[in-house]
Amino acid sequence: VLSPADKTNVKAAWGKVGAHAGDYGAEALERMFLSFPTTKTYFPHFDLSHGSAQVKGHGKKVADALTNAVAHVDDMPNALSALSDLHAHKLRVDPVNFKLLSHCLLVTLAAHLPAEFTPAVHASLDKFLASVSTVLTSKYR
């Protein structure tokens, strides 16, 4: 459960991401594909090379979903319901992959926002991404 301080930290950190959200989303995906090659199996139709338009496009989708989750941090289950349905029923993404992408997002944010990425912000973002992952996997049951 996100505390009021966590919510404040997440909103402030995501506010710093701003216009770079899509780029950071794409970078996190690239990190995931390189670090965890099995995740590529969900994207057989993508050009997964560095700078690929398809990876950039999906990175923007990831970032937009996270922006939506930040905006609706108190009601993520409703805000992410359609996305949860998509990943559980149509795409059938293994839930472990959300943890892998979350890790890569944290690394990407730490690399780009070193001054803002304090231990408290790191912990808050980690809890937030875990909450998003929980919501996205809630319809697997």
Curated annotation (Swiss-Prot):
Binding site for heme b: H87
GO molecular function: heme binding; iron ion binding; oxygen binding; oxygen carrier activity
SUPFAM superfamilies, per database record: Globin-like
Entries under InterPro entries matching the protein: Globin, Globin-like_sf, Globin/Proto, Hemoglobin_a-typ, Hemoglobin_oxygen_transport, Hemoglobin_pi
Pfam families recorded: Globin
Phosphothreonine modified-residue sites: T8, T108, T134, T137
Keywords assigned: Acetylation, Heme, Iron, Metal-binding, Oxygen transport, Phosphoprotein, Transport
GO biological process terms held by the UniProt record: cellular oxidant detoxification; hydrogen peroxide catabolic process
Transmembrane domains' residue ranges: none
Residues with the N6-succinyllysine modification: K7, K11, K16, K40
Expression across tissues: Red blood cells.
Signal sequence range: none
Residues that bind O2: H58
Record PTM Phosphoserine, positions in chain: S3, S35, S49, S102, S124, S131, S138
Annotated positions of the Phosphotyrosine modification: Y24
CDD domains: Hb-alpha-like
Self-association and partners: Heterotetramer of two alpha chains and two beta chains.
Family from the record: Belongs to the globin family.
PANTHER family per the UniProt record, alphabetical: HEMOGLOBIN FAMILY MEMBER (PTHR11442), HEMOGLOBIN SUBUNIT ALPHA (PTHR11442:SF48)
Protein name: Hemoglobin subunit alpha
